[in-house]
Amino acid sequence: VLPAVSKEECYAYRIVEQVCPEIADMTLLCMPFPMIKDAQKLELAHKRIYDAVEDYLRQGLRVGMLTIGDPGIYSTYMYMHRCAADAGWEARIVSGVPSFCAVAARLGISLGEKNEEIHIIPAAYDVRESLGFHGTRIYMKSGKKLEELLRVLREAMQDKESRVHQDIYGISNCGMENEQVYCGLDELE
């Protein structure tokens, strides 16, 4: 299963293809997962995708799903995992490298040391509450909300009462040929 419209548009496939060329000879099921917040529409989409996956399982075939990062962190895989497990199929999670760990390695920085806290925040939602968190704040999956996130961060840095030293980094497509690295709010904007 590729969570994309086509194998050409699937980053995970393009990465695996480089180290495992025989994947090109395998049956591929391209199933784009919608990135929407409407719970009812999302559930219907997941059911439709899982039904297609289960058709293969009923034929006695083994099914795998490629994702970027770790399947346990904001991953489309977990929806399929739960559906398969609930239906009585064996479902296994193979850990990957979380994107924020890859980013920290790429930047040569530590996410947390000694008693420092690390917070992972889904940036597609309201992030204001997270401004009070101490330690490292990792905003993931900002997508269409990036401008809003940057505005909130800029306002927080201008507020004299809450101003503390903050290093702000951003990376898109970490480790890929189209990787972009940003240091500071000015570069991100």
Regions found by a protein language model. Give the residues of each.
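A contiguous loop/helix-start segment that scaffolds small-molecule binding in enzyme catalytic cores
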Residues: 2-5, 15, 131-189
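Short gly/pro/ser/thr-enriched loop/turn and capping motifs at secondary-structure boundaries
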Residues: 7-9, 36, 98-101, 176-178
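Conserved beta-strand scaffold positions in the cores of enzyme catalytic domains, especially
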Residues: 25-30, 91, 120, 168-170
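A polyampholytic, Gly/Pro-enriched intrinsically disordered region
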Residues: 46-55, 110-122, 187-189
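Residue-level preference for the first positions of well-ordered beta-strands
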Residues: 60-66, 117, 136-138, 167
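Class I SAM-dependent methyltransferase SAM-binding "motif I" and its flanking Rossmann-like core
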Residues: 72-133
